[in-house]
Amino acid sequence: MGQVLPLVTRQGDRIAIVSGLRTPFARQATAFHGIPAVDLGKMVVGELLARSEIPAEVIEQLVFGQVVQMPEAPNIAREIVLGTGMNVHTDAYSVSRACATSFQAVANVAESLMAGTIRAGIAGGADSSSVLPIGVSKKLARVLVDVNKARTMSQRLKLFSRLRLRDLMPVPPAVAEYSTGLRMGDTAEQMAKTYGITREQQDALAHRSHQRAAQAWSDGKLKEEVMTAFIPPYKQPLVEDNNIRGNSSLADYAKLRPAFDRKHGTVTAANSTPLTDGAAAVILMTESRAKELGLVPLGYLRSYAFTAIDVWQDMLLGPAWSTPLALERAGLTMSDLTLIDMHEAFAAQTLANIQLLGSERFAREVLGRAHATGEVDDSKFNVLGGSIAYGHPFAATGARMITQTLHELRRRGGGFGLVTACAAGGLGAAMVLEAE
């Protein structure tokens, strides 16, 4: 066991997570079509403050993230402060760590709490895959800049004459890694091949995710942590996530064709997480501040770790790298955990990480550790389903996982929970949570 790094303030206070909330998650171009991420963020933070009954002036900092950023609102965090009636002097800034963005937001607020610069803050994230920053071609962009500098009409017309029809076509946001040109699904296909993960295994995990998420909603386990969203034209509110396939059968998954490697692939739309709209946030405080306000925390942040690996091959192995580090810093092992929640970007990615967490060879030869991190107990793993079922608004997923895991830990009488995710750029995140 390496160095334990307790997450406490100088006064010995633990970092308390007192409340968490999210919007329902909606598939791209469905219930939240036309609603930008900044409005989803305002929606969830406003409702979170109202439900918690914590005076807005108690919140001293808001750290929020957005992966698909809109040029007109580059600092989503500040817009949320200004749009929710919070104190105008509340510090607010935005972060982005791809699919681990709200993990980063939580870590940043925790660091401010430990430094003593604040006693309470909000962390979270929002994304919309339905309201996208559609750009222009590089040639058109350059001409538009030059036209702005031109002094005469003839100069402007000459510049425009350089353009061809193809230069006028809109440019959607990139879906591939900037440094490699690989799409996420291409990486998932790499991982399926590298680690011998079959189509049947991927479909089975996806089916499990949907079945468990549907059961969680049916049992009323998500009611406290998911708000009702009222959206224009206000005829029908959105109450639940709309991606979950509660009535599907395992045989249905086999009917879909591969989405990335059309000829030899195993990754399909059904065993991958869909493009999704939504927002999620949590309130963090020092333990003593929560007591002052008479609040009973959902739980505590015990440790966290962020890692990075090469992007060319199997780059979605973040959980296999960050989990041992987070456990080490928490002074725990896999066997100490009550729950494990891993982000399901793709079934192939999820199964590869599970495989490597239990691999002695990977631990020795790649991580330089004496022993494997530990086998993943299926009875503890993604017990309420995962991102394949719920969906994945990039910046909101971490906050969803944290809130969901803490509520489930409390239902089970407390214990330790691990939440972990891969992210674009070869990044990984893991956090250990504790509930009493």
Swiss-Prot record:
Q: What InterPro entries does its record include?
A: Ac-CoA_C-AcTrfase_FadI, Thiolase, Thiolase-like, Thiolase_acyl_enz_int_AS, Thiolase_AS, Thiolase_C, Thiolase_CS, Thiolase_N
Q: What reaction does this catalyse?
A: an acyl-CoA + acetyl-CoA = a 3-oxoacyl-CoA + CoA
Alphabetically list the UniProt keywords: Acyltransferase, Cytoplasm, Fatty acid metabolism, Lipid degradation, Lipid metabolism, Transferase
**Coiled-coil parts of chain:** none
Gene Ontology terms: biological process: fatty acid beta-oxidation
Q: In which pathway does it act?
A: Lipid metabolism; fatty acid beta-oxidation
Establish whether keyword Cytoplasm is in the entry: yes
EC main group: transferase
| GO cellular component: a single term | cytosol
Q: Report the GO molecular function annotations.
A: acetyl-CoA C-acyltransferase activity
Keyword field contains Lipid metabolism: yes
User: What does the record note on quaternary structure?
Assistant: Heterotetramer of two alpha chains (FadJ) and two beta chains (FadI).
Q: What does this protein do?
A: Catalyzes the final step of fatty acid oxidation in which acetyl-CoA is released and the CoA ester of a fatty acid two carbons shorter is formed.
Provide the family line: Belongs to the thiolase-like superfamily. Thiolase family.
Q: What is this protein called?
A: 3-ketoacyl-CoA thiolase
Species annotation: Escherichia coli O139:H28 (strain E24377A / ETEC)
